[in-house]
């Protein structure tokens, strides 16, 4: 499809009157954006359907979170993201490294986009994402807290349903993938409205 669009652009751009050039280019831009959305949907669906069982190894949870914070900071450095470890040392537990990288990238990026959406209506809002690590008995708790738009009173089951999305350009698979990763690691996840934003709470076995 993309190749066909490029050919149409090359063939007809110089044959269209100057009055119609703007509309022609704008329509091609819209089609290109729709192609990209379809491509993203296909890729995410493929990843979701083919996600393998986790390869469990001892990994440093703090390191994974910090690496993904650094990645998200490159998208929007105006949003302050920090890791708050309430334990005396780094957390080393069994998890699939590749899947957890995807998990935290998706969650932090989701928070970032929520804040960006809120900032479009109010540029004076606090732009913060706090990621807390706590321990409760035999479990590790990770809270991702942001100052975004919240979950608009949606229930967890609705949020993790494939293809459900509140975003104009969302595929509706991001949180479904997150939920599957957590479930495959024998953990649980909750999506909560929190003060002036949202809170995602992950509970994982401490082993």
Language model segments and positions:
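Conserved glycine-rich
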Residues: 187-188
């Amino acid at each position: 499809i993309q190749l066909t669009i490029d050919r149409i652009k090359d063939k007809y751009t110089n044959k269209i009157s100057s009055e119609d050039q703007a509309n022609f280019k704008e329509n091609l831009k819209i089609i290109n954006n729709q192609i990209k959305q379809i491509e993203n949907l296909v890729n995410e669906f493929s990843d979701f359907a083919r996600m393998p069982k986790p390869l469990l190894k001892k990994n440093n949870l703090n390191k994974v979170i910090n690496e993904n914070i650094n990645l998200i900071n490159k998208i929007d450095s105006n949003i302050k993201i920090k890791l708050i470890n309430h334990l005396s040392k780094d957390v080393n537990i069994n998890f699939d490294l590749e899947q957890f990288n995807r998990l935290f990238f998706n969650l932090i990026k989701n928070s970032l986009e929520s804040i960006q959406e809120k900032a479009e209506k109010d540029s004076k809002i606090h732009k913060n994402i706090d990621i807390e690590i706590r321990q409760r008995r035999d479990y590790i708790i990770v809270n991702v807290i942001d100052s975004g738009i919240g979950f608009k009173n949606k229930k967890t089951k609705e949020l993790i349903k494939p293809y459900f999305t509140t975003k104009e350009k969302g595929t509706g698979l991001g949180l479904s993938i997150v939920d599957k990763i957590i479930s495959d690691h024998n953990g649980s996840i909750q999506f909560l409205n929190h003060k002036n934003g949202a809170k995602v709470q992950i509970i994982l076995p401490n082993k």
